[in-house]
Amino acid sequence: MSKTILFTGGGTAGHVMINIVLIPKFIEKGWRVEYIGSKNGIEKSLVQNVKYNSVSTGKLRRYWDWDNFKDPFKIIRGCLQSYNLIKKTKPDVIFSAGGFVSVPVAIGAWLNRVPIIIREPDSTLGLANKIALPFATKLCTTFPQTGENVSNEKKVYVGPIVRVEIEKGNVLRGRRYCEFQQDKPVLLIMGGSQGAKWINDMVRECLDTILLNFNIIHICGKGKVDPSIGMEGYMQFEYIGDELPHILNMASVVVSRAGSTAISELLFLKKPMLLIPLTNSSSRGDQVLNAEYFSRQGYAEVILQDRVSTNTFIHAVNKLYTNKEKYIQNMNGYKKTNDEGIHQIIDIINEVVK
């Protein structure tokens, strides 16, 4: 009789990508695989080829909002839905990639006495995973320092995990996609899965100067492309899907937010990166800590947006390119492979199911 695994996680692409990597591995091994996500979350559009079950979710906010009064009831409803769904599905194990949708699933798993393994993509535990941790059998971490107060029996450091498609990127295909007229280094600018207005505005203020030395690929986010800008060597996209691995491989240097998924892929590809993390006022501070860790390891240059002018931004980009070989050399020292991390998680899941 085949085993059953449920995956959960969502809210941002970073809380889905690890599941997209793992799902085919379990399908290949003959497991029955299903997914639990939110009704309208990004995970619904990203997860394919498995049965998708939606449950009610409430967003876990750290700021005042009237929805904070409604969301506890949504979470309670989601717990009941998760409990019934897990009871009906009878999974052998559940794997959670975090995000607010995972909280009711973790509680539902505990009530059904089904083991749940949670994975934290960032350098500190997110609120959802903090809530889920007491119900979890194992915690898999991306950074070695994550969960310092969690017992070694429960915590396992597995390192960054990236999509296998990233390995298959082709530089020539990326060049054909962009059709740049001049042979210059390529600067890729990414603002995360939601885009980043601050980065978009800063880049556009500096375009004239940066284009003297670089071709620019700018991933702006949905609804954030500026059609009035038609400068040679500057290409804007709301989002890049299947072509992204080719674009990443083509890029000489990258400017990015400091979400774990993005910077893990850049580390895997050995791409020198200028990280501009979300500020503590805009998030729980995880991106700042991610960026600081990469900076300490010598993988990235970091600037904080509340201390940046157009001149300092331009200087940071030029400095990154000038010193790119130093960053590549430092990243070559990172020895943990993608396959190693994937197999480590699979082994943990198999061990828990025994």
From Swiss-Prot:
Disulphide-bridged cysteine pairs: none
GO MF annotations, alphabetized: glycosyltransferase activity; UDP-N-acetyl-D-glucosamine:N-acetylmuramoyl-L-alanyl-D-glutamyl-meso-2,6-diaminopimelyl-D-alanyl-D-alanine-diphosphoundecaprenol 4-beta-N-acetylglucosaminlytransferase activity; undecaprenyldiphospho-muramoylpentapeptide beta-N-acetylglucosaminyltransferase activity
InterPro entries per record: GlcNAc_MurG, Glyco_trans_28_C, GlycoTrans_28_N
Main location: membrane
Coiled-coil regions listed in the entry: none
Gene3D superfamilies reported in the protein's UniProt record: Glycogen Phosphorylase B
The EC number(s) this enzyme carries: 2.4.1.227
Membrane-protein topology: Peripheral membrane protein
Catalytic function, reaction form: di-trans,octa-cis-undecaprenyl diphospho-N-acetyl-alpha-D-muramoyl-L-alanyl-D-glutamyl-meso-2,6-diaminopimeloyl-D-alanyl-D-alanine + UDP-N-acetyl-alpha-D-glucosamine = di-trans,octa-cis-undecaprenyl diphospho-[N-acetyl-alpha-D-glucosaminyl-(1->4)]-N-acetyl-alpha-D-muramoyl-L-alanyl-D-glutamyl-meso-2,6-diaminopimeloyl-D-alanyl-D-alanine + UDP + H(+)
Keyword annotations: Cell cycle, Cell division, Cell membrane, Cell shape, Cell wall biogenesis/degradation, Glycosyltransferase, Membrane, Peptidoglycan synthesis, Transferase
Pathway annotation: Cell wall biogenesis; peptidoglycan biosynthesis
GO biological process, one term: cell division
Subcellular location: Cell membrane
Cellular component, GO annotation: plasma membrane
Pfam families, alphabetized: Glyco_tran_28_C (PF04101), Glyco_transf_28 (PF03033)
Enzyme class (EC, first level): transferase
HAMAP family hit by this protein: MurG
Biological role: Cell wall formation. Catalyzes the transfer of a GlcNAc subunit on undecaprenyl-pyrophosphoryl-MurNAc-pentapeptide (lipid intermediate I) to form undecaprenyl-pyrophosphoryl-MurNAc-(pentapeptide)GlcNAc (lipid intermediate II).
Family: Belongs to the glycosyltransferase 28 family. MurG subfamily.
Name assigned to this protein: UDP-N-acetylglucosamine--N-acetylmuramyl-(pentapeptide) pyrophosphoryl-undecaprenol N-acetylglucosamine transferase 3
Annotated source species: Bacillus cereus (strain ATCC 14579 / DSM 31 / CCUG 7414 / JCM 2152 / NBRC 15305 / NCIMB 9373 / NCTC 2599 / NRRL B-3711)
